[in-house]
Regions:
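Conserved beta-strand/loop scaffold segments within soluble protein domains that form the structured core
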Residues: 1-244, 258, 262-291, 295-296
Length: 296
């Protein structure tokens, strides 16, 4: 996709099937792709979207710049899934802007399984009685760099948001997370939570995290936090004492670390496929998505 996509779901329309868009980079020379996605979900509508980025010709430099805009009208439900499994020669800059109206529900899930250099930015404006979930999963190795930045603005009362981002970094990979929650003075009875958990699987991997919380109203429930650590040596010792090889024990612990993120996915096909891909990725095997319609 080199241009743009406009998806309009009319009032009251509830789509049962997932809309999937697959971008495959198959260039024989360095390339740049600029794309824009606009999603408008009407009142009391429902839509699920799955965007996938894949590379067919490895080693060809490519740059992707994309902007995604989501408008969720009153009572609408929008699920947006973004899966990136590209080559180390690929760089991607992605910005997502979402605006929710009263009583709407929005889920945004961004997964980076492989890339070169990726930066994802999320900006979400939350109205009254809305529910918002923002989830991110990153697995990076080599000299890959993955940054995620999120800003969730609660502008009205009785809204809920949850942010959860997890990273597994190995070799000399670099990760970054900058997450912000802002609760305005008129946003009483807001509940907003943010969590960033990171696992460094090598001595040279680095993670930079900066959770932020701004509250201008008293009657709220909010929390934020971040933690970065390494594999539990006691758990590794226990597993090895039970005859499990070290590499397999490490892979099992890392898979377990990501399992709750995968559990949040409400697309059964995508959830099963991600379990398969994460297992292959952490096992050092080539990613193979297979048939694209499997995830829907």
């Amino acid at each position: 996709m080199q241009d743009g996509v406009f998806i309009h779901v009319a009032d009251g329309v509830r789509l049962e099937k997932t809309i999937q868009i697959v971008n495959i980079f198959n260039a024989s020379a360095p390339m740049m792709a600029v794309r824009r996605v606009l999603v408008v979900a009407g009142r009391d509508s429902q839509v699920r979207l799955l965007f996938c980025d894949h590379t067919q010709n490895a080693g060809i430099d490519s740059l992707v710049s994309q902007v995604v805009e989501i408008s969720a009208a009153e009572g609408a439900t929008v699920d947006y899934y973004d899966l990136e499994a590209t080559d180390s020669a690929n760089s991607r800059l992605s910005q997502l802007y979402a605006r929710q109206q009263r009583g709407s529900r929005l889920t945004v899930n961004g997964t980076t399984l492989s890339c070169g250099h990726t930066r994802n930015e999320y900006v979400i404006a939350v109205a009254d009685r809305c529910d918002t979930e923002l989830v991110g999963m990153v697995i990076a190795d080599g000299d890959q760099v993955v940054d995620n930045a999120s800003s969730v603005f609660h502008n009205a009362d009785h809204s809920h948001s949850r942010q959860t981002f997890k990273y597994i970094l190995s070799d000399s990979a670099r990760g970054g997370f900058e997450g912000a929650i802002r609760v305005d003075a008129d946003a009483a009875f807001t509940e907003a939570y943010q969590t960033n958990r990171n696992l460094l699987a090598s001595e040279d991997a680095r993670m930079h995290t900066a959770p932020q919380l701004e509250i201008y109203c008293d009657e709220v429930k909010c929390s934020h936090g971040a933690a970065t650590g390494q594999l539990d040596q006691n758990a590794l010792f226990y597993m090895r004492s039970r005859g499990i090889p070290l590499d397999e024990a490490r892979r099992m612990l890392m898979e377990s670390f990501m399992s709750d993120i995968i559990d949040t996915i409400r697309l059964d096909g995508l959830q099963d496929r991600l379990r398969h891909l994460v297992e292959r990725r952490l096992g050092g095997r080539r990613l193979d998505c297979g048939e694209c319609n499997t995830c829907k």
